[in-house]
Amino acid sequence: MENGAEASDCDSDETVIEGSVTENEPEDEELPWRRLLLNQDTTCRSEFCFHSGVDGMQKGIHSPEIQLGLKLRKDSQEQNNKNKLLLALSEDLVLQDPQDKTAQNQVLLQTTKEFPVFTVSFPHPEVSWSHQNTGGHEAENCENLPHSKKELRENSDSPEVSLLSGTSPVAPDLVALKERLTEPVKTLAVPNTLSEPGEEVTQTMTSKETKDEESSLETFVSTLEKLLESSECTQEERLLEVMDDFNPQELFSTLSNSLGSVSVPLNAWAAQGRDELENKADAALPAKLLAAVNTGADVGPSCQGQEKSSSVSGGNGCLAVQPIMSQVDEDCTQIAQNIEDPKPFRLQTLTHENAISYEQINKKKNSDPIKNTSTQETPRVLRRSSRLEKLKASRDVVHTEAVLKKPERILSNTLSFKDQINSIFTTDSFSKRKNMHSSGFKNEQIRKSEQLRKKNGTGEMKKMCLCTINRRNVFGENLLYKAALHNDVDLVRCCIKNGENVNQPSYDGWTALHEASIGGYYQAVSELLKGGADVNVKGKYQITPLHDAVMNRHYKVAELLLMSGADPLFRSDHGTCALDEAKDSSMETLLMKYIPQQKKCHLSAQRNSTDPAHVEDMFQNKKPKLSSNNYTEFICDENFDRQEPGHLEINKGSNNLLMSKEYVCEHCQKDSNTTKFGKSNLNSVKNSRTNVSKRKGQKNRQQKKTQVDDRDCNLSQKIGTSSFRRTNKLLTQQQHAVQTLSDLPEESFELSTTTLSSLENGIGYNEACLVSKKSDTHVLDSSDGQELESVDQTEAASVSELSSYKEIKLLPVTTHQQPHTNQEQYSSPYKSLGNNSSNEKGKATNKWEDSFFSFIKGRSADSDSDCHTLDKSIASPKEGMSHDHHEEIMTGQEVDSQQRLSSENYFSQENDLKVHPLTTHPQEEAVNFCDSNLISVQHTPDYKNCLHEISFGNSYAKTEQSSTSCTRPPSTQKVSPLTVEVELLKGLQDSLAHRDSSPLVNQAGIHSLERKQDTDKNYTKKGPNTSSSSRPLPTVVHSQVIEITKAEKRREDLPGNEPINNTDFYSTDINKELANSSQLNQRKEKENVRKSDAELTHNDSEAERTLKSCEEKKKNMDSETHSPCDIQEHRKDQNFRKRKCSLKAPCSQGVNTTGIGKRNKKGESQLHVAARGGNLSRVKVLIEARADVNLRDNAGWTPLHKAASGGFDDVIIELLQAGANVNCENIDGIVPLHGASAGNHLKAAEILLEHGANPNQKDQKQRTALDEADDEKMKELLKSYGAIESTNGEKRNSTDLVKIPTVQPKRYKQFICDNDKAIGSPVPSHKAKKSESLPVHQTISAILQDIEEKQENLLKLEIRNSEDEEQYIGKMLEIKEVMDNILAQQKTERDDLAKKYRVSMESFKHGALREQLANLATRQKSLLVVAKKQKKIRLKIQNYKNATAVSGVGLRKLPCNSDISSDKKSQEPPTMGDSAHAQPGLLAPVSLAYGSMQEIPLSPEIESESQKINICLNAEAIRREEFSGNDINSKQNVQDCTLGGLLRSKPTDDAEKIASSSQPAALTPHAENSQAEATVKGCGFDSSALTGTINISEDKSIFSPNGACLAADPHSQKLSRCNPKRRNKKTASQQPSAGAAEPLPQAPAVLDTYTVHQTLPCLRDSAAAASHTDSTQSSLSSASAHQHPTKTVPHRNTTPRKKAVQLKDLILRGRINPGNNILEFKTQETTHRASVLPSGKLKGENGQIYQNPVTWLKELLGGGSYVTWNYAWNTVTYLGRELVKCVSEEAPMSAELNPPQLHQPHLSAGTSRESMQTIPHYLQIKEILQISKQELLPCHVMEQHWKFYVGRSHSEALLSW
């Protein structure tokens, strides 16, 4: 026995449950009841162990029960004393004779019915069961003992007493105790764990009731109850306290390890039925049980005396109540929840134990309560992943089989967890039991349970140690994993907070995120993702959580994963991504939102190439579905034969499809009675998509099948129409198409039966199943040795069921529109049932029909390997239709075999054709079904199709020839897509209106329309049918093809594809087709190019006529015609392909080039007509034939006008590429952009704008394209390209009135500026036409060259008389007007560049802006040369006037100048006549930089006025903040003032104004860092050019003649009012008023040649300064004289007061930049930071906006604090630097804006230095060194150096270097 005990301990591989104690534990940890029974003095603890039963197991076999030990807290002395009080009672209970014990047990049982609280264990640590005695010798039944020699001695050590429930199983090592209500006999079950297997110790004790025993038992129970109630915490609390240290291995611990601990569930005593013992005398087992033991049969628990039972189980029979334990994991980690039941501790069993009970109960068919539980869901007591249930079940099967083989095994009656809960809470007996408890105990339990919930819900979880969280069970699942599995969000959050690894996978590879995703637990998934879970974690088979969420249709979880970065295109080992797993359009749409746009094209092509269901999903919400209960009426014979179910098994390498389907075959007799076929049950057979790699594991999708019901309803038969098609992971779309037939003549029908027509890979029948009475099983094997590449391929098969035919008379069709010269033959290697032939080869499809062909995208289109053919019966209103398509896969062998076929006949179909004497054809039409985006089902009444019928061969027991034909795909040959589309007659359109959801409309396919050419012939069967034919016989389909699309555009990576060059399909997205081409197809495409042009092209004129006629027919089509694709879109795609084809073979189009220039009565050429109609192919051909793209019709319209007005984008692009003028005008001044804008053709307008169209060009009505636009999108598009609103345009025009003569010559036209803005400059018409097609830069350069030529001619002209003088002046003014407009354009372009520079400084270092800046500088240089010559011209006429001494000639001869500036006349004072004239003797030499200037007079009034204007504008420039509309307007006002004075002075001032206006344009490139750019480009500015500009502006007033009228005082006052506050800043010398101006010695305007070359300012510091200089220099054009006395005002520093400077000023001047937290204000306590906004305002840390730093500091320091500007700007720092320093650095620049006194030349006597303007100091930079960013110091280091050098003088800084 001792050896046995040792063996038992060694065999156990499980740890002990908390609360149970091993033999080697310390003395204080031993079980207290064991010590209590043995009268030991050690400190006792009460242990209460409860379980469903004691099931003794074999050695090494885990116990199938969960033992949950409950350890009471050590209540030292109080608990020990209470246990001692029970000692005597316990000894009496155990040591008395068996009879007394039996009586006591009975009394105890009856007494404790009202107190079913706990199970009491009496374990003995030292004494094994073999040494324990439970009764006398008379209670022993030796017959049932395996070892009869073992005797239980009375005075041996006391064994543990176990009072078990009636449901306790009698195991090999267990003696079951059973009771009966009428005769309460107790069986004491004592496990003998150390005995050999199969041994059983059974003892029966006859009960003899005695009052003493009863009283002793009552005393025991009451004492025990008091003990329990007096404890400080409930048993549940004590159980939860030890859960953290619980070992998961103890869940499987055997009884041997528990040392005989046996449970006594008091609450279950009265709940059990009593088993009647057959032999009361010897207390033996009942006969039934003995028989079961001896024979090894399985005997269920006996449930007798249920009616008499007063147990709480009520009508539930034999009930074993399990405890309601809340969330106990496999490792016994407790997830605390409240146990509301007053009887919380019940029995609990494992799942597999219940499963065994169910199995045995079902075998024995026991009582109804047990039967009910067999159908219940197995309780998931132990938390397992749903993926691992099979693994657990397989482990349990081995264990179960070993247990069931034992004859001694009697399975217990166990109920499911759900049933037990229901039995407790729903039965009436539960209420009785509830009342039996004392209210105090119940309230105590509830109260403490709530406390436990709060305690464990917060504190316990937070205190969980990491070892507990990371503990993993046998499946590798940790606590977080199981919490996610059960959607315990709190526990998930707690585990993550305690440091759990959220990406820890189980042994099977699954993570907690996988489990939460597959369950759809949104909160759990969210917590896991917040905790750092990898959203793309790969589980088993590379499956991501997104796969699980999508497959289970958890939309919110899927969206959460996608938002967290889940990849919807990641493919698992099965080759499927999450998008493929989508089961409905909603999920698919959700996934598509998170797919990058660049991948959608490729993805769509892939999906559509293999998934016809995807196409159907796109239209399922657009078309109503037919009900599956539609019925078909059919006329046939009453006697019909039914084919028995046939089984089709398709064996593929990685996927098998087994179809069991009943094919109903009706045999119709000629003399048949009417038979109505009832409602059809339409079932779909679902098959999973074939994958390249074999699928493994639990994620494998099972192929599903559905049998079509075949029923008889009186004389009716239900016809099952099934639709087989490919699905993406259970994505199944059922298509139903049933049409009601009636009133069909009997003789027009012959029975056709269901025929499986398969494609490419040999999945097909060699013979049709017609009226077969036996079931045939066809095993069709596809090639096993080859696997397709990369992506899944689909299977396609078509079955036409029960289709009737009716001969319908075809209407005659004209054949003049069907040329027979150019035809294409489409042949398909279908297996022929007979001799196939084509009776007509001259039929072609018209172009309009071709435009509605759907192109097969991707690999399925031209690969000839992945096709889905739907042989569909399209019936008239009197015709039945059914369809059934299967899926098949193409193999490389089939591709190779197909390559041996004729490449010309790449489309073929197997139709047995016959020629009937009548013009009839069967009404059943075969429609090809292939993957595509769209469906084209067009009904053209006048163009009938030669329809391909479905050939049903081998009419059973009937004629060999039949009007029905069977389309037979080959089983070994490759099949190209069958391109046949139904062209219905006009009379049948109404009947098809209600069939919107029919497969014809609902399934996208490639449809080839055929036209009936001969009315005397049609397609019928020809020759007898053959039962099995494997040779491919092509059926030629003729179709007129306008262009050929290369196969490489539509095929993908299928090896061995035969190139197809005559494809007649059109895709809705040519880009996707191009993207999906493969190298293999490109290599094979080269072979197709060699084909003759005769096969590829057709007569273009005939095609055009056909297209036009079809378009007219299309407009008249019935509204019910279904065309999901847009007509115009198809036409565009078609035109695109035409153009591609025309590029390859333009001469083969057959266009007559001799009549290209021929015009119609409107003056339109062929190109005009083609462009107007949007005929891209014809436009392309005409362009290739060198048609004039700029040819104008009678109204001045060009082909581009026509195309733009019609919105034909492709034609517009073609014309522009051919050289069409984008800005060509008609006689009304309308350009193509006007037409596109008026027609709201957004795409056309965008194309025109991209090619240089001017959005501001006006017609004769002064309307721009923006004025013509009505659509907001069109307006936004035009504005984005620089279009200006009409109000702005009016302002601009009113300003230009000053510059342009009042009567503008008609020969002048506008020209286009560089920034797409019209300036309205008058250019000679011949020059305008010449420069229209040239770039803007070249256009202006050409204009300047033309001006130079005119200037040379003027200089050569001799002025002899007044007529020559007038002619001279007129030409000079003409040149001046052109130059003025060019200057205005230059200035506008300069301003735009300045704005762009402020936005992005880096953009000027490269790209278009850099080139634009260089072009602007080049044009400016040319303009300066022209201005210099213009000055010479003015000097010439001035010298002539001076020489003739006729001073007033100039004014009398030029009245137009006053007319031009008539708006300024009102400002002229009455003293205008008192003008001073300069004397010729006052001329002094003026030294100019160029050395070419002559001596000219200098009026002091003019000089004074010029100085005043300059000072005023400089002062105003300081306050300028940005380039805004107000700024531009103010500059225009200044310019108007200067122009007024200039034009009133004399005509010779024109060149001065030009020169002065050119100054700003010359300075602008400097502001934009043009020097650096020019240096890089190698074309730097010429210093002389800039110097000349300044010299001209300096000396603009020199050229005033003696008789020139000087400006009056009000004009100068207006200029001085620019900024009244700064009048005192003027530096001009003012002289007293006098009748005539005093002569002033001339001052030589000597400027250093290098001065301007040295004026390259820093970009950031001079961007705004350049604009101010622009205004300053432009003001020099004023020649007005000031007549009031003037005083010389000494030079003053014009630095603005610091208070006037704001942050916005500093931002505009580049001193500071907007940013976040860049301003700081430090106090003793903290540092406050603020952000600077672009508007100059501040944003504090609290988000509040402040106007300036002063208000910010007031808020920080308190509302009552007074903050001055000086304090704020001295304490607030910008990046560590005080703001006041930024202002102080700005002061020198501001001062330099005023005329400095540096570099003044030597002046004559009487001339003050302040009166001369010089180059500002900041423009004297000699060179700029550009360095790379790598050479720059870090910001903080550079800031330190900068502060150091700023604080030192210039000399000290130089010394420091």
From Swiss-Prot:
UniProt effect for mutating residue 1831 to A: Reduced interaction with REC114
Keywords from the named record: ANK repeat, Chromosome, DNA recombination, Meiosis, Nucleus, Repeat
InterPro entries xrefs: ANKRD31 (IPR042334), Ankyrin_rpt (IPR002110), Ankyrin_rpt-contain_sf (IPR036770), RAMA (IPR040843)
ANK repeats: 475-504, 508-537, 541-570, 1162-1191, 1195-1224, 1228-1257
Biased composition (Basic and acidic residues): 1008-1019, 1082-1136
Effect of gene knockout: Fertility defects. Although female mice are fertile, they display fertility defects faster than wild type in advanced age. Male mice are infertile. Defects are caused by delayed recombination initiation. DNA double-strand breaks (DSBs) distribution during meiosis is altered because of reduced selectivity for sites that normally attract DSBs. Spermatocytes have altered DSB locations and fail to target DSBs to the pseudoautosomal regions of sex chromosomes.
Every RAMA domain range: 1687-1782
A GO BP entry: positive regulation of meiotic DNA double-strand break formation
Residue pairs linked by disulfide bridges in the UniProt entry: none
Tissues where this protein is expressed: Present in meiotic cells (at protein level).
Polar residues composition-biased segments: 195-207, 676-691, 814-839, 1023-1032, 1555-1570
GO CC annotations on file: chromatin; nucleus
Keyword Phosphoprotein: no
Region annotated Disordered, chain positions: 1-30, 195-215, 676-711, 813-844, 995-1038, 1046-1065, 1075-1137, 1457-1479, 1540-1570, 1609-1640, 1663-1697
Transport keyword on record: no
Function per UniProt: Required for DNA double-strand breaks (DSBs) formation during meiotic recombination. Regulates the spatial and temporal patterns of pre-DSB recombinosome assembly and recombination activity by acting as a scaffold that anchors REC114 and other factors to specific genomic locations, thereby regulating DSB formation. Plays a key role in recombination in the pseudoautosomal regions of sex chromosomes.
Subunit composition and interactions: Interacts with REC114; the interaction is direct. Interacts with IHO1.
Protein name from the UniProt record: Ankyrin repeat domain-containing protein 31
Organism of origin: Mus musculus (Mouse)
Record lineage: Eukaryota, Metazoa, Chordata, Craniata, Vertebrata
Gene: Ankrd31
